[in-house]
Amino acid sequence: MSRSKSSGRWLQEHFNDQYVKDSQKDGYRSRASYKLIELNDKDKLIKSGQTVVDLGAAPGGWSQVAAQIVGDGGRVVASDILPMDSLAGVDFVQGDFTEEAVLEQLLELLGEAKADLVISDMAPNMSGIADVDQPKSMYLVELALDMAKTTLKIGGSFACKVFQGEGFDELVLACRECFQKVLVRKPSASRPRSREVYIVAKGYKG
């Protein structure tokens, strides 16, 4: 399919998408908010008063949901290489968290506290070529898992977007080594033809 036809199909799907319409009505910054809402409904990831780290946070759909649930007694520390408009209850650091200066900012915001939950909806810029896109996406997931190991408290949780393909089974095994329970979820808001799924890992072993 030509790129123009593919782009046209995406635009048509986007404007007809019920989750896009709902996000505009409900005041969420992206349809991705509903993915986290569903994951949380099923797996009870976020609780009032918790500390949450959101990686790849822009435009802020997941941070919005997390901040609403943790409330005034909790906090959300978010990061992205892209800018993000400020959100109540969210401390945002712009930059690549694999760079030492950015990581230090994030850890400084966390202070003595460890995170209860690390979430990541990161995805690379897709070329449409699976052999190119899959390694890029797996690299981002591995970075997110490393960050979770750095910041999570014992018993904490991790939720991360991943695309099924080469490296997926190995990633699930890697998560099982450091978490007590690992699930693979496909939220309703994930487009059916997408290879996108979410790993939900609970009970960080340390």
UniProtKB/Swiss-Prot annotation:
Q: Which GO terms describe its molecular function?
A: rRNA (uridine-2'-O-)-methyltransferase activity
Q: Which Gene3D superfamilies match?
A: Vaccinia Virus protein VP39
What's the catalysed reaction? uridine(2552) in 23S rRNA + S-adenosyl-L-methionine = 2'-O-methyluridine(2552) in 23S rRNA + S-adenosyl-L-homocysteine + H(+)
Name the Enzyme Commission number(s) assigned to this protein. Answer: 2.1.1.166
Its Gene Ontology cellular component terms are:
cytoplasm
Q: List the keywords (alphabetical).
A: Cytoplasm, Methyltransferase, rRNA processing, S-adenosyl-L-methionine, Transferase
Annotated active site: K161 (proton acceptor)
Q: Which domain of life is it from?
A: Bacteria
Residue sites binding S-adenosyl-L-methionine per the record: G60, W62, D80, D96, D121
Write out the annotated subcellular location.
Cytoplasm
Q: Which NCBIfam families match?
A: PRK11188.1
Q: What does this protein do?
A: Specifically methylates the uridine in position 2552 of 23S rRNA at the 2'-O position of the ribose in the fully assembled 50S ribosomal subunit.
The UniProt family comment states: Belongs to the class I-like SAM-binding methyltransferase superfamily. RNA methyltransferase RlmE family.
UniProt xrefs under PANTHER family: RIBOSOMAL RNA METHYLTRANSFERASE, RRNA METHYLTRANSFERASE 2, MITOCHONDRIAL
Q: What is this protein called?
A: Ribosomal RNA large subunit methyltransferase E
Q: What organism, scientifically named, is this protein from?
A: Saccharophagus degradans (strain 2-40 / ATCC 43961 / DSM 17024)
Gene (UniProt): rlmE
